[in-house]
UniProtKB/Swiss-Prot annotation:
Pathways per UniProt: Amino-acid degradation; L-histidine degradation into L-glutamate; N-formimidoyl-L-glutamate from L-histidine: step 3/3
Catalytic reaction annotation: 4-imidazolone-5-propanoate + H2O = N-formimidoyl-L-glutamate
PANTHER family: IMIDAZOLONEPROPIONASE, IMIDAZOLONEPROPIONASE-RELATED
UniProt cofactor note: Binds 1 zinc or iron ion per subunit.
Family matches, as CDD domains: Imidazolone-5PH
Cellular localisation: Cytoplasm
SUPFAM superfamilies the UniProt entry points to: Composite domain of metallo-dependent hydrolases (SSF51338), Metallo-dependent hydrolases (SSF51556)
Protein species of origin: Shewanella loihica (strain ATCC BAA-1088 / PV-4)
Coiled-coil features, chain-numbered ranges: none
Name recorded for this polypeptide: Imidazolonepropionase
Function of the molecule: Catalyzes the hydrolytic cleavage of the carbon-nitrogen bond in imidazolone-5-propanoate to yield N-formimidoyl-L-glutamate. It is the third step in the universal histidine degradation pathway.
Regions that span the bilayer: none
GO CC, any one term: cytoplasm
Binding-site list for 4-imidazolone-5-propanoate: R82, Y145, H178, Q246, S323
Length: 408
């Protein structure tokens, strides 16, 4: 056999549902890589003969390989910070009160409008590096802090550039309908017209987005406005997704599911009607424990219903300056278990297999098996559950992206 590299003395959490063992585990395993893809994988005792003199062999010292982590919901391209609002919230102000007073998203919009592409790129690069050190190999980045055509395009251009200059794959999402800008506060329908007629057209013309998202909520966009944006995006051939049921239940998840959305995100107030709609459409439910924690929310997502209806559960950081300034995917694994009562296996699936489905890349990443992209991490742990159990110690020892060792 002729391979580019071989890994031995490892255990593999493949996350492949076709393998019945927990985590799709193969113990005392080996994995071979050829031309950026997994060429062979299985028990080490069954490893075919290969040229050991010409093939790099890496020894995992009994650690665990997992698929590269996928953070399927971030807002990591932004300027400024909102530490002052953190103080206000702790003094009793609500997220809605801050937003209606011109704070929240709008304060970050001002900072992003003033920042240059170079400044935004450097800030984004630092944050992407932080995620990459924790084993993230694919990430989604949303716009939404421009709320005018020029700045929305600027944010998406920066996200695209990050993908070109970093080993982490970047999927971009246009979120022009993130909040109603001050200049349209008395005419939100006119802003929706701008999002559809001008912003989205420009985004498509420059090929800046893989998907389109909307914040469907009482403080943002109505169900009807949301459907207008998503329907237009779908007709243009873009994937669609939705911030839904975070603060109330407007029925956004059910509507998005009927349109074929890849995911609906937050969903603390999702009801059984919405869960059933997700199940029927194959739409993923993205859980964002960072925002739940940071905003000190008490309404839990309907985890048991999602299990009952077998809706794929995704776990993501929602990294952003206002409601989840927590740039750590490993922390989300722990929070997913401690706050939402996911099992460690469900949490890891939410950052691998299911996250890939939410981004539409499940044919290439998210599980480890022959033919898939060689994106994987070596962890200095004795069980995959340790990734969710403990936090703060660097256990990510190696990262392979597209068959290349990128972190050692």
């Amino acid at each position: 056999m002729s391979w580019d590299q071989v890994w031995i003395d490892v255990n593999i959490a493949t996350m492949d549902p076709e393998i019945s063992a927990p985590y799709g585990a193969i113990t005392d395993a080996a994995i071979a890589v050829k031309e950026g893809k997994i060429a062979w994988m299985g028990p080490r005792s069954e490893l075919p003969e290969f040229d050991v003199l010409s093939t790099p062999v890496y020894r995992g010292k009994g650690g665990w390989l997992t698929p590269g982590l996928i953070d399927a919901h971030t807002h990591l391209v932004f300027a400024g910070n909102r530490a002052n609002e953190f103080e206000l919230r702790l003094q009793g102000a609500s997220y809605e009160e801050i937003a209606r007073a011109g704070g929240g998203i709008i304060s970050t919009v001002k900072a992003c409008r003033e920042a240059s592409e170079a400044e935004l790129f450097e800030l984004g690069r630092q944050r992407l590096n932080a995620l990459a050190k924790e084993g993230v190999t694919t990430v989604e980045i949303k716009s939404g802090y421009g709320l005018d055509t020029e700045t929305e395009l600027k944010l998406l251009r920066v996200a695209r550039e990050l993908g070109k200059h970093h080993h982490v794959d970047v999927k971009t999402t246009f979120l022009g309908a993130h909040a109603i800008p001050p200049e349209y506060k008395d005419n939100s329908d006119a802003y929706v017209d701008l999002v559809i007629d001008e912003m989205l057209t420009a985004v498509i013309n420059e090929n800046l987005a893989d998907a389109v998202d909307v914040f469907c909520e009482n403080i943002a966009f109505s169900l009807e406005q949301t459907e207008r944006v998503l329907s237009t995006a779908k007709a243009a051939g873009l994937d669609i997704k939705l911030h839904a049921e975070q603060l109330s239940n407007l029925g956004g998840s059910a509507m998005a599911a009927k349109l074929g959305a890849k995911s609906v995100d937050h969903i603390e107030y999702l009801d059984e009607v919405g869960v059933k709609a997700l199940s029927e459409s194959g739409t993923c439910a993205t859980l964002l424990p960072g925002a739940f924690y940071f905003l000190r929310e008490t309404q839990m997502p309907p985890i048991d219903l999602l299990r009952q209806y077998e809706v794929p559960m995704v776990l993501a950081s929602d990294y952003n300056p206002g409601s989840s300034p927590l740039c750590s995917s490993l922390l989300m694994l722990n929070m997913g278990c401690t706050l939402f009562r996911l099992t460690p296996e469900e949490a890891l699936a939410g950052m691998t297999r299911n996250a890939a489905k939410a981004l539409g890349v499940e044919d290439s990443v998210g599980v480890l098996k022959p033919g898939m992209q060689a994106d994987f991490c070596l962890w200095d742990i004795t069980t995959p559950a340790a990734l969710a159990y403990s936090y703060g110690v660097d256990v990510c020892k190696e990262v392979v992206k597209n068959g290349k060792l990128v972190h050692q």
